[in-house]
Structures are given as C-alpha cells and as structure tokens.
Amino acid sequence: MSVLKKISHFSQWILLYTLLAACSDKLSNPYPPGSFDHADQKLQASLDKQENTETAEGIILFVGDGMSIATVTASRIYAGQKAGQLGEEYQLSFEKFPYSGLSKTYNTNQQTPDSAGTMTAMMTGSKTKAGVISVNTLASRADPESCNGYHLKTLLETAEDQGWASGIVTTTSITHATPAATYAHSPERNWESDKDLSTQAKKKGCRDIASQLIEFDYGNGIEVILGGGRKHFLPESEKGERQDDRHLIQEWLAKNKQSSYVSSADELLNFDIKKTKYLLGLFSKSHLNYEADRVANNIDEPSLTTMVETALQLLQKHKRFLLIVESGRIDHAHHAGNAYRALEETIEFDKAIARANELIDTNKTLMVVTADHSHTMTIAGYPTRGNPILGFVKGNDSTGKSKDNLSLAADNQPYTTLSYANGAGHDNPEDDGQHTPLSYRSSPQKVGRHSTANDNPQAPNYRQEANVPFQSETHAGDDVAVYAQGPWAHLLTGVMEQNYIYHVMKHAGEL
C-alpha cells in the first residue's frame, strides 16, 4: 500500500473517531479500534505469535458463572463507559489473550445445562447429567444408590496426587455446584450439608458436600479454600445448619498443620501468610454479597480480586499449582433479571484476572477464562454509539446522527438495550422497594407490557424487561467463549465440547 493511501485511511478514521468521541476522553491509541491500521496492527501481532509448548508450572481456570457472550460484550461497553469512553471499543483484560474459541455447554440429558453438569465436564473430562457433581452420566440424580461407584476423578484430585498445590476461590458458597465439582462427588448438587440428605441417603452412606471438602484425602490436601457457605460447616448450636453436631471448621484446623481460618476481609488481610500453609476462609453464612453491594455498604467481605491475590501468594510458594476461581454471582444477578449487578460482577471478575496476570509468570502458567453456561440476556434495538448500555435505546436518524429523543417500540414506549427472554422482569421491571435482586417474584403476573415512561433503567435494583414470565430467569443453551494464554493455550481454539477444556489443562501440566 502506498504512503498516500495509508495517510488517507488514517485521516478518515481519526476524523470519524474524533466526531464519535467528542464527549469521551482523548485518544491514547494512534490507531483507534475499528480503523484500517488498527486491524493491520492486529494482523501483524497474530503473525508474530509463537506457540508455547512448554510444560505448565501453574494452571488457573477462571469460570464466570453464567457469563454469556452477551454478558462479556455488555460488560466491556459498561466498563468503557465508566472509564469515560464510548464503550464499544473497550477491551476487558482477558479479551487480550491470544487464543479464543467457543465451548458447547449442553449436559448429557439437557439441551440447556446447569452448573453442576457443566463444571463436571471441565473438571473431569467427561460430560454428565444436569444436577450431579463429578459422577458419570449413568448415575441417577438424587438417587442414594448412585452415591458410590459412579465417581469421576477431578483435575484437582489428580493434581494433588501428583504433588501440586491447589486452591479454590469463589464468591458463592464453597459447597455450591461449580466449586463443589472440583473436589466432591454427589448425585445431587443440593446435598450441601447433612441437613439436606434424606434418611435413605444417610442409610446408603451418602456424604454431604461440605463434609467431603473437609475429608478430602488426595495428596496433602487443598491448600487454599476461599468463599462463602459457613452455615454448612457449623452445627446448629454454632449458628450453622448441621444436624450431626460436627464442627467442620475445627476438624479442618485439627487435620492440617500450619493452617489458618479467616472469616472477614480484615482477617484475610492480616493473617500470618509466612506461617500459613493451609488457608480456609468462609466469609458469609451463604453466598458473598454482590460486589456493588459490598462496596456501597462497606461490608467486611473480601473482593474476588483480594481473594485471588491471596491465593496466588500462598500457592506460588510451591513448584506447581492449580487454582480454580469462580465468579458465581454473575449467574445469580441474571437469574434475578438484574443486569446492573451482573455487569458489576463481571467487571470485578475481570479485575481479578488482570491482577492474577500481574502476579504470575505468563510463559509458565496456563490461564483459561470461560463460563459454565449462558443466560438469556440480549443486546438489541439499534442504539447509537456510546448509548448507555443500561439505559433506554436512543437510535440514529436517517442521516446516521444520534436522535434527540428516545426510540419507541410499536406500543409507543421506550425500551432498554438489555432485556431477557424470560424472568421476573415481565410484570414490573422497576424494583418496588420490597424485593431485592435475590428475591424473585413468587407469581409473575401474566399481563401485557407495563408503562416504561417513568422507569429508571440505570437504577441498581432495576429488573430489565423479560418476554416470558418466570419467577427466576433461566440459563440459555448457546455456546460460551473460551479465552486462553500460556503453555498449550493454542489448543483452545475453534468450537469445542466443554469437556475438552479439561484435557487441554491436563496435557499442559502433564498431569
């Protein structure tokens, strides 16, 4: 290409981008995203990529629970807009990873999956049914007869057996489906404590998930466990839910020498890391608070970023390590039809990934970022560039310029860019002050679209509109993205079955 043509392309894009970004921060990149030269620069970077075929000394799997591709896109725009940009051109840290692909998430018995079956696929290398934890597809859900003889060995168990250090970090209860699939085996994801076991299950010797974590006997044990769900580990006399009078936290401390237990953000920041080999942190009775609420209400719980940073500080004392990280409350916010909290959780998830990237040797650590399944949130409506992602749609006129007024649907009412195919937002998206995003409407009204004229779609408690009335919004069955960097990351490209991710991680670490 001639110099004059390059100058022409460059000048045209700078002029266009300057007009679009009139209300944004000044450009720091001489080749703005979307320009000819930016794409050419990207091509050169791709041509220069070298495949890393070294054995991984560390493996980190980041799982954004329910982090659909639409969630990633909306969070990217939201983060960019919070930074003063138009938003669409922004990149989350993991979107800069050199390799990416798509993961097919179905369970062996469901077109649209649940977290138990999908995480089992990533942790064991085999797909299974919905609702079961690291047992094979021959097991029957909630059947006590399936408690024994159907176990699938997990990557974490294999790593511990081969002398690796291991850690689990989550913003949900540590006994919830996704983290549980790393260490437990159960035909029922809801058997989190002995209280949840049926009489028949107890007779058959079925073990609750919390007790399986404490009794974990592979290698020298899991070094780092951080999350919520304290009630599953304590007897009723200690404000827990256990009916067998076991105090699992005390059992864990007695079992592991050089161990520390923490239950608040302050304690996590101040425990003696030099004298600690094993760390257990249970920061709430159930799930941790949403990140937005934690910050707004100054709650004494750690952020996901802080937990990941602490976990890596401990695990990197060892020659090789495996760390599993879940941002679990993205999923919960979507179930509640509350896009604001889903996006805030995703942004914190991205911050945790960025911090991990700063702490590790990226040439020796395989890092994989993905989701277990999708959700029904969509991005639609022809909004103009830079339109608030949580706001009502304002489109362009026939000349391509932004309109002064909001776009209206066929019923002459404004509509939001983000909406759900189903969920609690069907009858009245505006929170009435009596419902929190975790409290679903018990009986959504089957009524027509309500008036949106006085809605504030950017309010934290706003429930985006939903087409079909559900008490809780459902998962979706579309593929989710996989992002990877480090040793053997180039194997995670194209369209893959979800259980393939396990095989790449196992190969990368020679496990």
What are these regions (language model features)?
Residues S2-I14:
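Bacterial N-terminal signal peptides that target proteins for export
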Residues L27-S35, S134-A142, H318-A336:
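Short acidic, glycine-rich surface-loop motifs adjacent to enzyme active sites
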Residues L27-T71, I77:
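N-terminal module-boundary/linker segments of secreted carbohydrate-active enzymes
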Residues D48, L61, K104, N109, ...:
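Long, structured ligand/cofactor-binding scaffold of large enzymes
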Residues L61-F62, I168, V369:
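Structural beta-sheet core signal
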Residues S126-S211, G221:
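Extracytoplasmic mature domains of secreted/periplasmic and thylakoid-lumen proteins
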